Curated annotation (Swiss-Prot):
This is Probable GTP-binding protein EngB. Its cofactor is Mg(2+). Mg(2+) binds at residues 37, 59. GO terms for cellular component: cytosol. GO terms for biological process: division septum assembly. GO terms for molecular function: GTP binding; metal ion binding. InterPro entries: G_ENGB_dom, GTP-bd, GTP-bd_ribosome_bio_YsxC, P-loop_NTPase. PROSITE patterns: G_ENGB (PS51706). CDD domains: YihA_EngB (cd01876). Necessary for normal cell division and for the maintenance of normal septation. The gene is engB.
Length: 197
């Protein structure tokens, strides 16, 4: 998809702060430092729109990125990072759970996992939780440029097996460094939203 307009339109910690224009939303979930901000920047052709950080756990709000005035990417705080207090983690958890389980505009979750490693227990819990709530999932294996091409399929198979992936859930590989998988990711997203480019 050709992105002509992209902006961070809303930052929210509670439902009253969510967008009101009823555009379809795709949430991005994943462990801290899996590359969500880099994924957003590459997909939207905007280098510094989503701020990347060497500090895991940097995103502490729901960040709504409006794209072409047609849909939103919603960056969700990364999970599985220990260097925040239990109280903060509980607050994030509640905020994320409320958004994911109650938001009508949410059409799917892009769950990002690192292609180099088997999904963690947190990844598995997140995937199972979304399945429990009937939320469609598009799995994106990031950092594909970090391993040889010959190992991609083996790693994707391991990811699918570890998560006990449902056959209907797409599993894509992606590299924010090279743009690999970007067109396929957009095709999958638009197909899922049943909208044309």
């Amino acid at each position: 998809m050709k992105v002509t307009k992209a902006e961070l339109a809303h930052v929210a910690v509670k439902a009253e702060q969510y967008p009101k224009n009823q555009l379809p939303e795709l949430a991005l979930a994943g462990r801290s430092n899996v590359g969500k901000s880099s994924f957003i920047n590459k997909m939207l052709n905007r280098k510094g729109l989503a701020r990347t950080s060497g500090q895991p756990g940097k995103t502490q709000t729901l960040n709504f990125y409006e794209i072409n005035e047609r849909l939103y990417f919603v960056d969700v705080p990364g999970y599985g990072y220990a260097k925040v207090s239990k109280t903060e983690r509980a607050a994030w958890g509640k905020m994320i759970e409320t958004y994911l389980s109650e938001r009508e505009e949410l059409k799917a979750v892009l769950q990002l996992v690192d292609i180099r490693h088997r999904p963690s227990e947190d990844d598995q819990l997140m995937y199972n939780w979304m399945k429990h709530y009937g939320i469609p999932v598009i799995l994106v294996a990031t950092k594909a440029d970090k391993i040889p091409k010959g190992k991609w399929q083996k790693q994707l198979t391991a990811i699918a097996k570890t998560l006990d992936k449902e056959a209907s859930d797409p599993l894509l590989f992606f590299s924010s460094a090279t743009g690999l998988g970007k067109d396929e990711a957009w095709r999958t997203i638009l197909n899922h939203l049943k909208v044309t480019e």
